[in-house]
């Protein structure tokens, strides 16, 4: 799990060491992880709901249950769950967790990018994405968009 973080930091250090003329800085560690257990992929990026509350953030969470392929009758379809944590005041994403099939890796990495770029729930609800029946949820039921909409409805 530390290799992902170390690799990102090493790219920055290497670029700075060799004076590559691009601004590179570490804006902090997101804490982004994924694992595979008996056919289910789990991922987490940023703060969990429990940690955010413990740290004193006023938050709103968006949660969505779905499937990782469309239609759900395709062979190998796995149930999915996505939870996104947002600041209640600003709507900026603070964290997210996912549970699903192999497509979970791309979803948790998108959440990590959203955290790093300080995206708001309104930006996530208008996210444009590529979908394919065997690779992703349906474009009408994309979990990041639906979780952002769920959070928005609670603000």
Where are these regions (language model features)?
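A conserved FAD-binding loop/helix module that cradles the flavin
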Residues: 1-47, 135-155
């Amino acid at each position: 799990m530390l290799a992902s973080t170390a690799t990102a930091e090493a790219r920055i250090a290497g670029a700075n060491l060799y004076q590559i003329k691009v601004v590179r800085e570490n804006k902090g560690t997101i804490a982004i992880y994924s694992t595979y257990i008996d056919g289910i992929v789990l991922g987490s990026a940023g703060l969990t709901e429990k940690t955010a509350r413990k740290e004193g953030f006023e938050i709103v969470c968006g949660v969505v249950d779905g499937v990782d392929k469309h239609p759900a009758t395709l062979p190998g379809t796995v149930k999915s769950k996505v939870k996104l944590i947002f600041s209640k005041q600003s709507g900026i994403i603070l964290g997210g967790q996912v549970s699903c099939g192999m497509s979970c890796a791309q979803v948790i990495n998108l959440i990590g990018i959203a955290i790093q770029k300080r995206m708001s729930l309104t930006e996530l609800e208008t996210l444009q994405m590529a979908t394919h029946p065997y690779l992703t949820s349906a474009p009408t039921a994309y979990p990041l968009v639906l979780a952002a909409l769920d959070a928005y409805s609670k603000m």
